[in-house]
Curated annotation (Swiss-Prot):
Residues 183-459, 518-734 form the ABC transporter domain. InterPro entries: AAA+_ATPase, ABC_tran_Xtn, ABC_transporter-like_ATP-bd, ABC_transporter-like_CS, ABCF_EF3_subfamily, P-loop_NTPase. Its main location: cytoplasm. It comes from Schizosaccharomyces pombe (strain 972 / ATCC 24843). GO terms for cellular component: cytosol; cytosolic ribosome. The keyword Acyltransferase does not apply. ATP binds at residues 215-222, 551-558. SUPFAM superfamilies: P-loop containing nucleoside triphosphate hydrolases (SSF52540). Belongs to the ABC transporter superfamily. It is found in: Cytoplasm. One of its GO terms (biological process) is cytoplasmic translational elongation. This is Uncharacterized ABC transporter ATP-binding protein C29A3.09c. One of its GO terms (molecular function) is ATP hydrolysis activity.
Amino acid sequence: MEQVIQNNCSEVDPHVLSYCTGYANDAIKDVDEASDHTISLIRNLLLDAGAREEAVQLIQNELEKQFKEREEHLDTLQTNGLVRLKETIRMDSQSEISSTMGLVGEKMELDAVKGRKVESRVDRRKLEKAERKIRAKWEKRTIKAEYESSKLVQPEQKSYEEFYMAVNPLDLSGSNQGKSKDIKIDGIDLAFAGHRILTGASLTLAQGRRYGLTGRNGIGKSTLLRALSRREIAIPTHITILHVEQEMTGDDTPALQSVLDADVWRKYLIQDQEKITNRLSTIEKELEELSKDQTADQAISRRLERERDELDLRLLDIQNKLSEMDSDRAESRAATILAGLGFTQEMQSHATKTFSGGWRMRLSLARALFCQPDLLLLDEPSNMLDVPSIAFLSEYLQTYKNIVLVVSHDRSFLNEVATDIIHQHSERLDYYKGNFSQFYATREERCKNQLREYEKQMEYRKHLQSFIDKFRYNAAKSSEAQSRIKKLEKLPILEKPQTEEEVEFEFPPVEKISPPILQMSDVNFEYVPGHPILKHVDIDVQMDSRIGVVGPNGAGKSTMLKLLIEQLHPTSGIVSRHPRLRIAYFAQHHVDTLDLNLNALSFLAKTFPGKGEEEYRRHLGAFGVSGPLALQKMITLSGGQKSRVAFACLGLQNPHILILDEPTNHLDMESMDALTRAVKRFQGGVILVSHDVDFLDKTCTSIWQCDHNVVSKFDGTISQYKKFCLSQQPTMTIKT
């Protein structure tokens, strides 16, 4: 089949050909797969990809031929009645009997006939066919997993505009008006790089609902979002999709214009509208000149009039679509979104190539919010934002009228934004009404109920089995025993509810030292002379300090931490430290400090030599890196697992003070809870920078604000600081 498709459709994208070939071979193997459905699917795929009609017809003919051959060689399995074999079969060895003997519906004790020649009631040919059928079903699932993996591992490289137009086709006819924007897809199988992500899962998303997708690190949440964004999972084409996954590519386009250009169809329609308007103007002039010329050919006039009428109709469709897109308010909407995400009016006019990676990520988010897709997919949006920007995004999304599916570890953000929670685990998706706090409470209760039901069912089955074992050979009770055997066989297979292991982090005990511990006195700092980053900073860190530092990105928070650990030196002022003070510093980009070609155990031994393997293992185990995980190369670990190795490095330093720069990035909820508990138990001082409101609220007793080159104590809690930020932000709602 592969050769036929390749030879006839060489001009079609190789990824499409690969998918069609695999799907066709898979369907031919599967005795349950309907031929009409397969042929129709492959035909439409090839035609949409630009294949010639006659070439597609040849492929269709070949498919029909192969399906016909399959049907001719496929006999129906007979499971009822006895069939006398044409020849007897020697059954001297039980090990030679097929494992599918149970298919015949009756049992016999083979040991009782060992050494004798018996006439089997099993038709060998039909038994082999049954085995092939079972094997084909298993192969089908494996093959589909390989195709899903290949499509995700090697995605097509397209520009943003090409990808947008391919994923979100334009409808000018209005045929999609009134269609439901709800999504309901059953039987989803998804794999990535050979690992099963979902098996037979159901995805249900209702318009106007905002879903938080939660689950442990490495469970496949980001993979699911990517599959949805590429329509690997069959989302109806009238539903527009946008996924904020990676930073945009920088060029000379101003930031504001790049947001406007994100709505590709709006840009295309405006250009088309201008072309049509110019052409209509030209036609009117030509008609006017023809009307003055008595010798002019009337056929030319009629042709121009027909063209004018057609262009008038198309122009009307375009204007209606632009009105539906709220095109006249586009620039003000884009500017407001950018302002909410921290872009000043001056920054909005800067070329996108002048922004750093973090700011380009914000631009990607702004572009998605501006487009207002029917399905907005956000993957850890708070990782790229500061507290003021998170507050703006949270308020903005609460007025969003379409579907939002967001992956986030920020509990406070999910509590404010999410109307529902989807819990991804064990290759399935479970749904919960309410925000994250409600989900957390409900899940605990649901798990307890499932465990109670499982134990109850197991007790019932044990009771049935006990009766069967006792009376199955008792003549008086044999009928009752047989009845219970049938009842037991009809019961569904039970799987014990899976409980997720609780993660625990543990920092070592702290040796007490007398104050003063760590101080900054009238510190000023400049990277470039004449451009101050920090001015007149005074801060005192004690053994019982729990200081949270917040403020806009780029305000100097990380710079202040680097001054405290003497990675940077002040332009003026004094940073004083206790002579015996040990500080453990967690860098925001901690992955850069790890040798990813080593395993965690070897890395700790290399970085902190002189200790035994057991001590290294103990420190890694204190942060959930144990067993085989400690021996895996760190390049194969997830972001959260790498963070755990970094925390283990902190523990080996036996610190008096922990200085943490965005420690919650990449951690799942369970790891965040473990880190929160560990920081609260830590007996030394803590100063940390974080955008996670819930983490700050649970670990910090004082909030310091870094803004406009000044670091000052905020008089209030982190929640009050967030409200203060919102009061300074532009208001923005979504047009209904």
